[in-house]
Amino acid sequence: MYKRKLTASDLLLIIVNLIPLYCVWFEGWSASEVFLVYCLETVIIGLVNVLKMASVTLFVRKTDTWENGGRSSMQSGWFFIFFFIIHYGFFVFIQTQIFFAVSRLIPNGSFLGSYAKIPALLGNNGKLMLIIFVAYYTVQTLFEFFTSGKYKTVSMGRLMFEPYIRIFVQQFVVILGSIFLNFGAGKIFILIFVVAKIFFELFINFNRFLEIAEKRERLKKEREQQI
């Protein structure tokens, strides 16, 4: 379950997350802006995952096995993508609404109005950090997904669920951090948050959880076939 060897991608992750920590503590960046960017990181990860799934569908295989309630069927890769967008999009909506309500960064308003205020709340520093995050995930995807050849073998089902475990952990901490913002302890909590995020990203092998789940599913199918 634990990673033992750090890669170049891991070192880049450390740098990317230490930049906002340094800027909040020593350059006067707003902790609220930084927390908002970490909240939006969920959206970035989702968009990157859609691009991965689309690449597999376009260049590797048009269909893949869809598991549902113990039954399996072949479905188009676009079906996987559509399902992911709806399911993950709903998840992002719930998470952002909770974040907005708890942090009180965005005054009560209309549904679309709340999201329309995000660019202004980010400010120049928040937008810069958002660009850094987009660049990081682009580079990470290029090397870990395409250059490594992973896109040729990964299943659409596996790819569809890869973001969830990591995002569950991150968003729980982000929402917890939004409570600290209300008490003016943003700088302290961002220190705790960044250290915790780096630890979980570097030393907890999230993909291992998916591998175990896939192995259990295969064993279950094998037992059913033997009966």
Regions found by a protein language model. Give the residues of each.
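Short, amphipathic, aromatic/basic-enriched membrane-interface segments that mark the entry/exit
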Residues: 1-11, 156-165
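The first (N-terminal) embedded transmembrane alpha-helix
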Residues: 8-24, 34
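Hydrophobic alpha-helical transmembrane segments
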Residues: 20-28, 176-183
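Hydrophobic/aromatic-rich structural module bridging two neighboring secondary-structure elements via a short loop
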Residues: 34-97
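Alpha-helical transmembrane segments of multi-pass integral membrane proteins
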Residues: 75-103, 123-140, 165-169
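Membrane-interface interhelical connector segments
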Residues: 101-123
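Hydrophobic alpha-helical transmembrane segments and adjacent short intramembrane/lumenal linkers
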Residues: 121-195, 206, 210-214
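Short, highly charged, low-complexity non-transmembrane loops/tails of multi-pass membrane proteins
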Residues: 207-227
